[in-house]
Amino acid sequence: MPPVMSLRALICVVLIAAAPAAAAPFVPESDSQVLERLPFSSGDPGLRRLRGLNDQLTRTPNDLPLAILVAQGYAELGRTTGDPRYAGYAQAALAPWWGLDRAPQEVLVLRAALRQRMHQFDLALTDLATVLNTNPRNVQARLMRATVQQVQGAYDEAKQECRALQDLTQELVWTACLANVNGVTGELRQSYEQLLSVFARYPVAEPKLRSWVLTSLAEMATRAGMMTAAEAHFRAALALDAADFYLLGAYADYLLDDGRPPEVLALLRDKVAADPLLLRYALALQAAQHSQELPARVEQLRDRFAASRLRGDRVHLREEARFTLHLLNAPQEALKLAQENWQVQKEPADIRILLEAALAANDATAVGIATDWLRNCRLEDMQLSRLMPAAKHQG
């Protein structure tokens, strides 16, 4: 088992990588611009400390340990808040090494995490390969490579990386890694039960690790239709990390699918700065028939996605496809977005919006692509199962 600080660093980097970015990162032109734009709260000691570290880094920009600390701090803020600027601030902290092919390993791992956040998956894999070619026992790089490969649908490769972790880190970490992959390739119930059993043996694990595992358990339970168990896992995870916007989005999706839009509105009312959370808030308004507020939120989302397109940012294609299908009722355009997104990432939510849009657009070819994928990877998902009768009819 790695020492506590190493495990914390591992969890930090992996969670940073796993969290979706809210938009293309803002990369400041100077350190003064960073300080000028950051929404620091004077009452938050953690943010005050980070600002102090950034001040110090401005004076000693080539201090690698300090730069890593500052970059991790910014990246963690981006993960929990969904503010896209923080990824840019993290990149700025690493500026002396960012463009180097052979940067220090700590930089390569963190750069890979940030690139994954920006959906630059191939670049992230290149960085991780460089690290692992030099140090095959780098746990952060192996776990992150498994995560990227799973997102891309390279499941055999992801499983290989997870198995390689068995001799490198604690059982809970590698079990969660393997359960996440097996859980989308035909072994959902077994993976859930195995991870739940191992998790019970780590009651005092690091809180961020527990939150990550609980979120995985919640998503697996949701796909399996075990709604009571999913609810318990989501609530336990939120008790540990109530500010994590990925977790908030996953729980909001669970509540929407469970027909509980008023709870989504209460959950996200003051958290709509992040585009994915604003989308779920608007979907809840629609489901709850809040006709007065909904038009303004739809226009807000329309403006945000338009601005993203102008920047060349296509990180949130999945969310834009959901918006276009469910809030604009434009299935043909939604299908184009879902297909573009499918070229980049292949998670359960991606195949779901692809199939939903294909069915709404009456596109038998696209329906066939989605159902072939589901059959080949053996993905089990209650919501997708409900779509299959219509898919078989169209296919």
Identify the residue ranges that each predicted region occupies:
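N-terminal leader/linker segments that initiate helical-solenoid repeat arrays
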Residues: 22-106, 126, 393
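Canonical positions in the second alpha-helix
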Residues: 56, 96-97, 130-131, 164-165, ...
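Short coil turns that delineate tetratricopeptide repeat
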Residues: 61, 102, 136, 169-170, ...
